[in-house]
């Protein structure tokens, strides 16, 4: 159910009811295709449908990957993020082989970047070396305003339109639109 409508987007936030979805899905036939089937009923109403997944690689994420045309992968510029990225890539390959052979990686988005730290610079360089052109030019910095916006139930563009976070996500949107020819 859409809980927030604006001129440019609709928002369906996760609710507490989603917490039991993994358990419910586990016993259902064709469980990997449930989200795909649900989205088919509304896909013509939207130019893009973005699904923000939890960092876990369970049935909810597999459902999202099965339903998706492409994945935008956010990568925190921190050490353990590289480890998690390897696991994510393995899951993507499994989903491609078993459920969605056309699943594409749209790009890698570097997030929580703090240019004052050597680690952020090193992680950024490693990701760019490995993924090359798949890494978006836009980099999301660490930002207090970005971390505050969700607690007010708002996107950063609505919460603080002049903030660096809003500017960066606007740049990312433009980069993605250019990538997909819109």
Regions flagged by a language model, labelled:
Residues 150-171:
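C-terminal boundary of histidine-terminating zinc-finger modules
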Residues 11, 135-139, 156:
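Conserved beta-strand scaffold positions in the cores of enzyme catalytic domains, especially
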Residues 40-144:
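Conserved catalytic-core segment of NTP-binding enzymes
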Residues 171-182:
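C-terminal alpha-helix
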Residues 1-44, 99, 149-152:
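P-loop/Walker-type NTP enzyme "switch/lid" segment
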Residues 34, 87, 168:
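Charged catalytic carboxylate motif
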Residues 28-31, 81-84, 165:
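Short, conserved glycine- and acidic-residue-centered signature motifs
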Residues 14, 138, 142, 161:
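Active-site donor-binding loop signature of nucleotide-sugar glycosyltransferases
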